[in-house]
Regions:
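Conserved short alpha-helix immediately C-terminal to the canonical SAM/SAH-binding motif I
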Residues: 59, 83-86
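Conserved catalytic-core motifs of GNAT/GCN5-like acyltransferases
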Residues: 76-79, 87, 91, 96-113
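Conserved GNAT acetyl-CoA-binding A-motif
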Residues: 60, 67-78
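Short amphipathic helical patch at the helix-1/turn junction of helix-turn-helix
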Residues: 46, 80-81
């Protein structure tokens, strides 16, 4: 399915030749001119048996590079607040947390918050606003 959707590009990470991780780069809809500069990194996942080998970082950087090459200036993503390793990775790669959704997901009958992140991809990034 995902390979047939032109707005989505699938990335996979392999460990010992076996697909162990994946992520998707999603373009905004063509009719959304105001957000044509930004793309979304979504459905990033590393199999439990393959964690700790740098696949998440490799995939994230590959998606960033593809987004940059496609002309996007901003990459957005979201993650459950319980995904500590992913959150730490995104911070280390320069992503900025800009919002929290308190009812992002339901896991085992309980709400889990979601964190929203964004990163400017162009080297001539606009300076951050100061209060």
């Amino acid at each position: 399915g995902v390979l047939m959707i032109p707005e989505r590009r699938l990335f996979v990470g392999r460990l010992d030749g076996i697909i162990a991780a994946s992520a998707q780069l999603v373009r905004p809809p063509r009719n959304n001119e105001a957000q044509a500069h930004s793309a979304q990194l979504t459905t990033s996942f590393v199999a439990p048996w393959a964690r700790g080998h740098g696949l998440a970082k490799m995939l994230t950087l590959a998606v960033e590079n593809a987004a940059r090459e496609a002309g996007f200036r901003v990459l957005n993503l979201d993650v459950r607040e319980t995904m500590g390793a992913a959150i730490q990775l995104y911070h280390s790669l320069g992503y900025k947390h800009f919002g929290t959704h308190p009812h992002y997901a339901r896991v085992d009958g309980r709400y889990v918050a979601g964190l929203y992140f964004s990163k400017l991809l162009d080297e001539a990034a606009e300076p951050e606003e100061t209060a």
